[in-house]
């Protein structure tokens, strides 16, 4: 899955 963290996916 895609998890967007710290400004990126």
Curated annotation (Swiss-Prot):
PTM annotation: Forms a cyclic peptide with subunit A (PhTD-3) or with subunit B (PhTD-1). An additional intersubunit disulfide bond is formed.
Cross-linked sites for Cyclopeptide (Cys-Arg) (interchain with R-1 in subunit A): 9
One Gene Ontology biological process: killing of cells of another organism
Keywords: Antibiotic, Antimicrobial, Defensin, Disulfide bond, Fungicide
Cross-link (Cyclopeptide (Arg-Cys) (interchain with C-9 in subunit B)): 1
Superkingdom of the source species: Eukaryota
UniProt entry tagged with the keyword Disulfide bond: yes
Site of covalent link Cyclopeptide (Cys-Arg) (interchain with R-1 in subunit B): 9
Residue location of crosslink Cyclopeptide (Arg-Cys) (interchain with C-9 in subunit A): 1
Disulfide bridge positions per record: 4-9
Function comment: PhTD-1 and PhTD-3 have antimicrobial activity. In low salt conditions PhTD-1 has antibacterial activity against the Gram-negative bacterium E.coli ML35p (MIC=1.5 uM), the Gram-positive bacteria L.monocytogenes EGD (MIC=1.6 uM) and methicillin-resistant S.aureus ATCC 33591 (MIC=2.5 uM), and the fungus C.albicans 820 (MIC=1.6 uM). At high physiological salt concentrations the antimicrobial activity of PhTD-1 decreases slightly: E.coli ML35p (MIC=2.0 uM), L.monocytogenes EGD (MIC=1.7 uM), S.aureus ATCC 33591 (MIC=3.6 uM), and C.albicans 820 (MIC=6.5 uM).
Similarity comment text for this entry: Belongs to the alpha-defensin family. Theta subfamily.
Subunit structure: PhTD-1 is a cyclic heterodimer composed of subunits A and B; disulfide-linked. PhTD-3 is a cyclic homodimer composed of two subunits A; disulfide-linked.
Name of the protein: Theta defensin subunit A
Source organism of this protein record: Papio hamadryas (Hamadryas baboon)
Species lineage: Eukaryota, Metazoa, Chordata, Craniata, Vertebrata
